[in-house]
Each structure stands twice: as structure tokens, then as C-alpha cells.
Amino acid sequence: MTGTGEAQQMIADILRKIVAVYAPQKVILFGSYAYGKPNEDSDIDLLIIKDTDKRPIERWMEVKRLLRDRNRTVSVSPLVYTRQELEQRLAIQDYFIQEVLEKGEVLYG
């Protein structure tokens, strides 16, 4: 686990890279870093919303490659959905997605 200031800087750096290179519509931080309860096993959980024709695994790999940093002590766990996929998840009352959208911290968009 990193200190609060260090964690905030790391998240800001990650966000800058995602916005500059991946150009998402929205980025939401969720999980322990968003809810103020990170521990030594916590990762940075991000929901990234981007309209694209790429398959889910291709999107995930693209973001993971973009964020690869051997010096970072905290891993990043991105979820990449299109707006249509999010709407579908909400239509079936996906509790996880509902919670992320309600409790997560919008970092961009």
C-alpha cells in the first residue's frame, strides 16, 4: 500500500496516460482506493467507458499494455466497457455495475 498522497499522484498519472492515449468517454475509480480503504493487497480498480468495435479482450489488453510499468508497486485492474454494454448490464440489474456507477469516483468524463 502507498501513502494517500503517493496513491493520489499515481492515480492521476495513470488517468493522464489513459485520457491522452486511449481517449475514453469516462473513467471511474472504484474499489478500495475509491472508498478510502486500501491495504497492502489493494489494486487500482478502474471502469473505463469507451465506444469501440474492438472485442472485450482486445480492449483489456490494449489498456493493460498502455499501463504497464515495472516500477509501479500497485497493480491496475481495468474494466473496459462500451456505453451499450453498460446499458445492457444495467438492464439486467447487474449489481456490481450498479454499485460501481453509484459509489465509484468519476475521474474523467
Residue ranges and their predicted role:
Residues M1-K26, Y35-E40, K50-G109:
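Catalytic core of pol beta-like nucleotidyltransferases
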Residues S32:
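Conserved H-loop
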